């Protein structure tokens, strides 16, 4: 299995959600990108049904580097099982370019 980044965006309607600190939440609000803070994630309280619902409602996730280590602790293995563990975004990168990069990346799996 692997992933390839394409020049064009094959899935422009792909839904991306941001798990961010305050800086990224503000940037997401300005760019009209759905976002959740650490407190919003803690409200899910490791309830498997809610985490599965969250994983199903978005195609991909982006997380602030300050939050990335806490995500397995807060959410448990739910996102990993769905194959949607978040990509890291730093304060230097713009959320819009990162979400476009994710939209342009195609995952594939080889069969024997």
UniProtKB/Swiss-Prot annotation:
Molecular-function GO term, any one: RNA binding
Keyword Nucleotide-binding on entry: no
- This protein's UniProt keywords: Ribonucleoprotein, Ribosomal protein
According to the UniProt record, one GO cellular component term is: ribonucleoprotein complex
UniProt superkingdom = Eukaryota
Query: Per the record's keyword annotation, is Ribonucleoprotein included, yes or no?
Result: yes
Q: Which Pfam families match?
A: Ribosomal_L1
Q: Which family does it belong to?
A: Belongs to the universal ribosomal protein uL1 family.
* Name of the featured protein: Large ribosomal subunit protein uL1
**Source organism of this protein record:** Caenorhabditis remanei (Caenorhabditis vulgaris)
- What's the gene? rpl-10a
């Amino acid at each position: 299995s692997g992933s390839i980044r394409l020049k064009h965006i094959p899935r422009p309607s792909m839904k991306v959600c941001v798990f961010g600190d305050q800086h990224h939440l503000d940037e997401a609000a300005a760019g009209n990108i759905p976002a959740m803070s650490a407190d919003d994630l803690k409200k899910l309280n490791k309830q498997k049904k809610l985490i599965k619902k969250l994983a199903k409602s978005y195609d991909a996730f982006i997380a602030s580097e300050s939050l990335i280590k806490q995500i397995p602790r807060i959410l448990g293995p739910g996102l990993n099982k769905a194959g949607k563990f978040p990509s890291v975004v730093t304060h230097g990168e713009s959320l819009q370019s990162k979400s476009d990069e994710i939209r342009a990346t195609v995952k594939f799996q080889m069969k024997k």
